[in-house]
Amino acid sequence: MPRQQPAAARPVRRRSYDQFCASARALDSVGDRWTLLIVRELLAGPRRYTDLHADLPGVSTDVLASRLKDMEQGGLAVRRRLPPPAAASVYELTERGHGLLPVLAALAEWGAPALTERRPTDAVRAHWFALPLLRALTGLTWEGVLEVRLDEGEFHVRTGSGAAVEPYGFGPAPRPDARITLDAELCLELGRGDVTLAEAVKDGRIEVAGDGPLAAELRGG
C-alpha cells in the first residue's frame, strides 16, 4: 500500500516585513487590505461594529473583526462600552490612529484622478467625499462646522484648527455654522485642484447658506 503523503502545510502569514525601515514598519500596521478604509470610517467618530460593516461594502465579518483586533493590538483603535441606555460597544481611534489623517488625505489626493466615471459595481457614501473636500477648505480661517449636502447624502466637516482633531462626521450637523450644497463631481474637482473653492462659489456651482462669519468667508466676504 503506497504511503500517504502528508498534506502540504499552509504558509504562515507574515505579520512583519522585518525591515528596519519606517515605511515598512508603517505598512506592518496599516498595509493589510481594508485597514486604512476602517481608519477612514473611524476618522468620522466612534462607530459600532454593525455600522462599520454597513459602510464597508464587500468586507466579510471575519476580516473586519480580524482587522479591528489588529488595530487594537497595534494601538490604532480602542473598543469601549457606551453607558446606558445605549449599552453598545464602539470602536474609536487612538491619538496614533488619528495621526493617519494626513496619510488618508494624501491618498485621496493621489487617487482622485482615477475617479472618472462611476462603475456599476461602485458603492458610494456621501462622507467618502469629505477627504477630497477638506483639501479645498484648508485655506479657510474661520473655525466652525460646515454642513455639506450632496445628492448622495449629507455629512459635515470642521474648518480651521478643529479639522485636525475631528475632521468630518456623518449626516447633518446639529448646529452648523454654514451649509453648502454641491455635487460629488465638484468635490472631486476641488480635491484634484481643477477648480478652487472661490471659483466654484463665484460660478454658482456651490450654494452657500448661513449668516455667520464662516458663511461670509465662503462667499468671499
Residue ranges of each PLM-predicted region?
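N-terminal leader segment of winged-helix/HTH proteins
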Residues: 1-30
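N-terminal helix-turn-helix DNA-binding core of bacterial DNA-binding proteins
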Residues: 21-60
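Basic, amphipathic "hinge/linker" alpha-helix immediately C-terminal to the N-terminal HTH DNA-binding motif
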Residues: 31, 83-106
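Residues within the DNA-recognition helix of helix-turn-helix
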Residues: 67
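Short hydrophobic beta-strand motif reused across regulatory alpha/beta modules
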Residues: 76-77
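Acidic, aliphatic-rich amphipathic alpha-helical segments
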Residues: 96-160, 164, 213-221
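C-terminal interaction segments
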Residues: 173-221
